[in-house]
Amino acid sequence: MGAVLYHVSEFRGITAFEPRVPPSPDSGIAQPVVWAVDDQRLHNFLLPRDCPRVTFYPAQESTESDLRTLMGPSGCTVRAVVAIESAWFKRVRDARLFLYRMPPDQFEIADAAAGYWISPRSVSPLDVVEVNDCIASIVERQVELRLVPSLWPLRDAVVRSSLNFSCIRMRNARAREGTTP
């Protein structure tokens, strides 16, 4: 059986996804594609699209020190952490998302650690599930939702660590302390 893939949207009723150029050059992909995420990393996207977040989880080579420092005491009971800025809490709480299940045979893996899959052609979803409680959907996946005043200190620590991570929509995060917006 192949991977279970999703495209997450705040819009209902999408019948086909068209390839688009990725908004960030960090993806390393220059051509237009349709993006999907596998079920293992779906928690990274169970938030409003523009919500900045830092997500992280153990890698095979993660050190005990990094696990203890960044995953915290819950590290033994959660499989990942999704951190958002506390200013986004109400928007996350009130968000409604649509999980479009995608046909895996039309996608190829782009980044195994991040769970990213891409297709260079138009893709029609197999079905759709509505999510009315993003917080519960994240927590039910054994993922900690962490609220922080600013993502930057955590982002910097995670990037320097031995953990796997994704930093998503950071352009929407609060300005770093000591910088002008």
What are the residue ranges of the model-derived segments?
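Short, flexible loop/turn elements at secondary-structure junctions
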Residues: 10-12, 36, 104
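A general structural signal for short secondary-structure junctions and capping/turn motifs
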Residues: 25-27, 34, 88-92
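Long C-terminal interaction/binding lobes of large macromolecular proteins
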Residues: 39
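Conserved NAD+-utilizing ADP-ribose enzyme module
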Residues: 47-181
